[in-house]
Amino acid sequence: MAETTSLINEPDVDFHLKLNQHSFNIPYEQLQRNSRYLNRLIEKEIDELNSHYERLNIALGSGNIEGDKKALQELKDIIRSVEIFEKRLQKRVNEEVPILKRLEVRINFFKELENAKQQVADITPLMEWYLKFTNILIGDYLTRHTTSNSSPELGLPGVTFLEQEGIQDLLDTDILLTGNRISTALVDNHDLRPLLDWINDSKSYLKKNGSRLEFEARFQQYIELLKASEYEEAIKCFQDYLLKFVNTNFNELTHASGLLLSINYCKEIMKAKASERSAILTKDDGNPLENEIRAYKYFFHKKPKIVEQQHVKPVDLSYMNLSQNTDFEKYMLLLDDKRWGLLNELFLKDYYSLYGISQNDPLLIYLSLGISTLKTRECLHHRRVAKSSSPLVDKKVEEEVLQNSCPVCDKTFAPIAESLPFAHHTQSQLFDDPIMLPNGNIYEAKRLKRLAKYLVDIKAIELGETEVIDPIDKQIYNEADFITMYPT
């Protein structure tokens, strides 16, 4: 068999390693964290044992029964301390085993690619490797998009899919699920506890990178305590967690202090607005104009021009004059639930940055790259096709001729492709015998004649021996009208 080359213009293994560097960054970071924890654990145990030995020596040197009893107790404490230390040590060692296994599996995965690339006579191993890699991307997407609303019967779709394919060690689902869990707690449940726990474990990294996450999280905690009227706890939170940021976030702390004084006014206005919107949705007096005005006000938060000049009695609140204050408007923004979404974005940015993971879905990135290389200026245009007098002709032409196999125009990928740039080329197709019809449409003469014969054979239309039908505008032309084209 003659030696052939790969049908794919394939980049080398180093390229793939750089592209998937996070596959090794995550286990490495986990091992580093484990190592730091072990060092702290060992240092703490050494200090504790030294203290025990000092007390033991003092007790043994006393030379009396009471001292001997203390020495015996110290020995028991030393044994107990060492046993606890061994258990903690073993726990950390056990946690490292699956991490090291992941690294080994991933190294072998890229060795498979290297071996597949060497088999130039058979691209099957290379295609199998890419299929496995595609499944990893699908598993990543499913894992990232697992929500608290997912059906219990489905469990964790991403993890289940990866296990079924036998590639669970090629993706760090635990890291993705942890990030997803914290993100869901923020956006769906407005729960700060998982985030604060993660911040506490990642303080050194956040401080090293100058992150605002800890401040914003504690600021949100302070705001939620004020909303719940837990003023003492809010003040304690301010003193314990926010004051240390006075040099870097002075303006925000000023607003935090002002919010404490204005919170009751803010809550009253929020209640008034909520009541007004509720009334708009529930009230219906049968007056079409009034209903239209209420709907407009609800969606656009202002009166339509037709009634702007009419006198409307203001809400009778003694504090409404405060709303003209610029700071007061800032306080209202602090109470807006949109802050949870902003906090979530800040968390995900730092979280994925820690592990070197792309914040965007890798599957969508790869799809976007592939689609953008195929997208031309002719893509995504809705074709206008004329209807003929015969429904059967329209159906057969649509099925046999006008079927669009372009992946960019496919309804599945069109939403992704719409915002992507055009490729620096156009797709051209040369025919052996291109002809132009009088209406300007260009076709391959053989295919046009074959279509005419097919439609006549199935009795969809009556055509003369030298007549053809344009599949676009459904007009009938004679072969004598063909204009021969010459590609240049």
Swiss-Prot record:
One of its GO terms (molecular function) is zinc ion binding. Keywords: Cytoplasm, Metal-binding, Nucleus, Zinc, Zinc-finger. SMART domains: CTLH (SM00668). Pfam families: CTLH. A zinc finger (RING-Gid-type) spans 406-473. It comes from the Eukaryota. InterPro entries: CTLH/CRA, CTLH_C, Fyv10_fam, ZF_RING_GID. One of its GO terms (cellular component) is nucleus. Residues 175-233 form the CTLH domain. It is found in: Cytoplasm; Nucleus. One of its GO terms (biological process) is proteasome-mediated ubiquitin-dependent protein catabolic process. Its main location: cytoplasm. PROSITE patterns: CTLH (PS50897), ZF_RING_GID (PS51867). Involved in the proteasome-dependent degradation of fructose-1,6-bisphosphatase. Belongs to the FYV10 family. This is Protein FYV10. It comes from Candida glabrata (strain ATCC 2001 / BCRC 20586 / JCM 3761 / NBRC 0622 / NRRL Y-65 / CBS 138) (Yeast).
